[in-house]
Amino acid sequence: MPKVLAIVLAGGKGERLFPLTSFRSKPSVPFGARYRIVDFVLSNLVNSQIYSIYLLVQYKSQSLIEHIRQNWFFSSVGSDHFVTVVPPQMRMGPEWFQGTADAVFQNIGLIKEHNPDIVLIFGADHIYRMDIRQMIKFHIENNAHVTVAARPVALKHASSFGVIITDPDHRIAGFQEKPKDPIPMPDNPDMAYVSMGNYIFNADILIDALVRAEKKKQHDFGAHVIPDLVGRKCKVYAYDFAKNEIPGIKSYEERGYWRDVGTISAYFDAHMDMLGEKPIFEIYNKMWPIHPARYEGPPVKILDGEIKNSIIAEGALIYGGKIENSFIRSGSIIEKDVEIKDSLIMDDVIIKRNSKLYRVIVDKKNVVYEGEKIGFSAEQDRFRCYIDSSGICILPRAARYNDWIKEINHA
């Protein structure tokens, strides 16, 4: 295997995920009962035996930096085994990162110092499993300069992505970045072939492309670098993500599952995809684990109640009530006679007795008051919650911090 360096772009604002991104970047938003969004790309890299990883951060990065420090460190097994967070250094000038390509250009010295054969440029804000070694194999076998991970999406959604036009041998002949009128796939007029935002570059090609882009003040891979490489007849190929084989995948799972959780509704739906006896994305896969945050507290304790089709993390304390189609993260306390349905309860939340929640996201360090009902009346909810366009109610992080502190001290 060639010498590989991975650069993970983890600086996204995640504005469409507001208010979950009020105090954190999109990659550090909690996901599932034990994870953060960034854990999926990092798990894919480590499971693929890729251990040299730089994580480029920018906006509201402290939460992400702490998560990496506490959960993603390697023992002293060699200088090429690291997950290193890289904030903007501003060595090239006073500006922060101006785009995805500019973020890598500003750290071009790290690439030269590491001296890899190939460089992976991956995003940090998608939910999926991928054996990246198979994409590397495809890249090498095709003698490619650049390989772009790609997948089909419905034509009506393709305007949100970079749309790819390929030759029969998978070489990219055209690239449209977020076009108003995307070109459909030749064999399926209802679908378009789109970039997943994950790239493999030969190191020399990447360095040259970044320097060219900087001279033109072009700062984005999808909008500038990839189209320029295609236009200059470089060997740019598309890797079909649907052909990626993951060990341990069940027959009932969706083939090539990949979700952009950039909106509240998409984020919520991706959670629901993990529930049920036969979920389309099975989080329980010992052969390709998603590595969670370490938790040093006690196990979950359930004293009473009725729990259906839900995932409960360590450290949760459940006194009773009904929980259905929901996620409860670490340290949360659910009192008696509570009803929670189709909801996401994040870390260290207190749900007081006789309260009812339906399609609600309660961010961390919050309290839901005794007898309170959220998710049943938009007219009432708008005074106490953020209501997404999808109708999902969100109680922002620490929105009731003073009351939460009183409950903690009282307990």
UniProtKB/Swiss-Prot annotation:
Its EC number is 2.7.7.27. Keywords: ATP-binding, Carbohydrate metabolism, Glycogen biosynthesis, Glycogen metabolism, Nucleotide-binding, Nucleotidyltransferase, Transferase. NCBIfam families: glgC (TIGR02091), PRK00844.1 (NF002023). It comes from Thermodesulfovibrio yellowstonii (strain ATCC 51303 / DSM 11347 / YP87). InterPro entries: ADP-Glc_PPase, ADP_Glu_pyroP_CS, GlgC_bac, GlmU/GlgC-like_hexapep, NTP_transferase_dom, Nucleotide-diphossugar_trans, Trimer_LpxA-like_sf. It catalyses: alpha-D-glucose 1-phosphate + ATP + H(+) = ADP-alpha-D-glucose + diphosphate. This is Glucose-1-phosphate adenylyltransferase. Involved in the biosynthesis of ADP-glucose, a building block required for the elongation reactions to produce glycogen. Catalyzes the reaction between ATP and alpha-D-glucose 1-phosphate (G1P) to produce pyrophosphate and ADP-Glc. Pfam families: Hexapep_GlmU, NTP_transferase. Pathway: Glycan biosynthesis; glycogen biosynthesis. Homotetramer.
